Amino acid sequence: MMLGLSALSLFLFSCNDQNSLEQQSEAIIRKHTIRFTEPPKRIPNRNSVDAPLLGNGFTGVALAGPPEAQTFYVARNDFWRLKSALDESYPLVLGKIELSIPALEGASYLVEQQLYDATTTARFTKDNQSVSYKTYVSATEDLLVVELEMDGEGSIEGHVNLSLPGEKEIINKPPLERVFPDEREVGITKEGVLYLWRAFEDSVDIPTKAAMALRMDQSSDGSFVLEPGKPVRMVCAFSSNFKSNDCVSDVIGRASDCSSSHLKEVEKHHQEWWKDYWQKSFVSIPDSVIEKQYYLSLYGTASCSRDKDFPPSIFGTWITRERPNWNGDYHLNYNHMAPYYGLYSSNRIEQADPYYMPMLALISRGNYYSEKVTGIPDGILLPVGAGPLGIETTRRSPFMDTYFKG
């Protein structure tokens, strides 16, 4: 009997202890909200951007534009042009979600990001009308969910569209800045699901393809009307040829099948994933600025580093312009290493795992360079520029011999 009571006491203590951990981590991290009071200026950009960033470790979304023309830039860790040659391999822009609400021109701008549950909210106010939305990239499914609503009098019309990267996103300044041929399509199904895809299959070492599809509630063409008390929701699904045999059909199907009950489960699992993530370790210090930056860094890492074979590029998942500087590659010095320094001490092992994969994939090439360059057989000498799946971003090529003879 005493043994049974002891076991019960241990169970109750464990439950209380777990509840205490949840409460402590939530109390610390919920204090930290990232606030933007004006639209970002450095987007699209070949480097890092100054925009609100969302992601799930596979897909990244960067928010741009004024209230009347919100743009969601979409990129994926596994969507590259993959060719072992200098300046021919780099991460790509998949596409853009363009949310147009002309009546909001001149409205105030406020975007806030809550780190604890990885949810972003926006509020735009003009005169006696306000439009707001809540959005997140699901941590457990490759989905972006956006819920729009309005306050005030009357109604507001809007339109959502998917677009491929254009002149702002793709640099074309030959001979040094080259554009390589891709296949692409943007369209709408008879059921009103918007979709687009891009693929790089010509003159590459490894073919790549990525797709996204968006469905807007009660809309057959992307148009919608906001009225007080009547929220409108849109769902966008993402995939690639590395995650699905037919990524286009996959995203169209998943966007079509997102019922209200399913999305409630998606949000629940999303919140649970982030709650578990923050409980892996947490700390509170007297310096609130440093503490906030610490948790912001962990938020960013969880948002971009979960795909083992495809680590985030040098600027994270959030690619908004092609070609990113330094090909956006895994520069095998502190540039690739530094983002992972604190992940073991903070117990974020899942986010650290992708670090090793580009180097492991280059072992056979490293053996070749070791013997050819140093005369040491069975050694490993890696190039400075690496991509995923054994790709070299700095391999000698006719282009290199022509324009970089020094």
Q: Where does each model-flagged region fall?
A:
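Bacterial Sec-dependent N-terminal signal peptides
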Residues: 1-23
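Hydrophobic alpha-helical segments
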Residues: 4-6, 54, 294, 336
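Acidic/polar, glycine-enriched structural segments that form the non-catalytic walls/loops
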Residues: 15-330, 348-355, 359-371
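Well-ordered alpha-helical segments within folded domains of soluble proteins
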Residues: 333-344
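Active-site lining segments of carbohydrate-active enzymes
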Residues: 347, 354-406
